[in-house]
From Swiss-Prot:
Summary of the function given for this chain in its UniProt record: The key enzymatic reactions in nitrogen fixation are catalyzed by the nitrogenase complex, which has 2 components: the iron protein and the molybdenum-iron protein.
Species: Nostoc sp. (strain PCC 7120 / SAG 25.82 / UTEX 2576)
Gene3D superfamilies tied to this protein: P-loop containing nucleotide triphosphate hydrolases
Gene that specifies this protein: nifH2
UniProt-recorded name of the protein: Nitrogenase iron protein 2
Co-factor remark: Binds 1 [4Fe-4S] cluster per dimer.
InterPro entries in alphabetical order: NifH/chlL_CS, NifH/frxC, Nitrogenase_Fe_NifH, P-loop_NTPase
Length: 297
């Protein structure tokens, strides 16, 4: 069954621990508040892409249930698709046990099952929440198979988050010319790094995209998470809730979809040195020499 072309298929990518699932769920909750009909397809083996929507530890995954039944064809849509906050439809694809098989298989199996069983009916946005620092064929599947059309990379001013963002941009570029996938922007999930906004705006420019929004750091996010809720539900009148609404509105109205221009590692390191995130080799050598001298005394 083909997917209605009017449905906007977006994906959130980002390195592990960056706050990708938290950012995506809070943003999608805000979009649902604005009347958008949302389907979330969790593509992370942790199966934590929907827990704030459902107020639960982790949703039972398509792959887990299929293994219990013997085949994915034995499942009913209602068993794997639950309804959460503001009517958001929630599915987790799941993955195999650690060290066994390819986690990408769960993504492929789940998406095919959902398409064939009508999960994409009556929705405005389908959102794929994808583990982003593993750039393998399975995790790239929403891009490779021309499912996700708009990619949003959750990053911060930390070196590894930026490194992952550049890698993801490289993955998007690989499939941009054969399909319709485009980069919608970088979402800076703040880590309070010095000059963070300027740094991510500079990286975005180098990648031929935009920093679509800067999400400030606020403990209310953790308070809501402890109660397994989105900020929009836990503290709807909070400043942080409004930040997610601003981001949601920007995504809904975003037409700035570009083919990215990933940079070489040397250029990324030069950028990090320029902003004081990374020491130059010369300065690092001086620091090591100074440390060695002080120890010998």
């Amino acid at each position: 069954m083909s997917i209605d072309k009017k449905i906007r298929q977006i994906a959130f990518y980002g390195k592990g621990g960056i706050g990708k699932s938290t950012t995506s769920q809070n943003t999608l909750a805000a979009m649902a508040e604005m009347g958008q009909r949302i389907l979330i397809v969790g593509c992370d083996p942790k199966a934590d892409s929907t827990r704030l929507m459902l107020h639960s530890k982790a949703q039972t995954t398509v792959l887990h249930l299929a293994a219990e039944r013997g085949a994915v064809e034995d499942l009913e849509l209602e068993e794997v698709m639950l309804t959460g906050f503001r009517g958001v439809k929630c599915v987790e694809s799941g993955g195999p046990e650690p060290g066994v098989g390819c986690a990408g298989r769960g993504i492929i199996t789940a998406i095919n099952f959902l398409e064939e069983n009508g999960a994409y009916q009556d929705v405005d946005f389908v959102s794929y929440d994808v583990l982003g620092d593993v750039v393998c064929g399975g995790f790239a599947m929403p891009i490779r198979e021309n499912k996700a059309q708009e990619i949003y990379i959750v990053t911060s001013g930390e070196m590894m988050a930026m490194y992952a963002a550049n890698n993801i941009a490289r993955g998007i570029l690989k499939y941009a010319h054969t399909g319709g996938v485009r980069l919608g922007g970088l979402i800076c999930n703040s880590r309070n790094v010095d000059r963070e906004i300027e740094l991510i705006e500079t990286l975005a420019k180098r990648l031929n995209t935009q920093m679509i929004h800067y999400v400030p750091r606020d403990n209310i996010v953790q308070h809501a998470e402890l109660r397994r809720m989105t900020v929009n539900e836990y503290a709807p009148d909070s400043n942080q809730g409004n930040e997610y609404r601003i981001l949601a509105n920007k995504i809904i109205n975003n037409e700035n979809l570009k083919i990215p221009t990933p940079i070489e590692m040397e250029e990324l390191e030069e950028l990090l040195i320029e902003f004081g995130i990374l020491e130059s080799e010369e300065n690092a050598a001086k620091m090591i020499a100074t440390t060695s001298e002080s120890k010998s005394k």
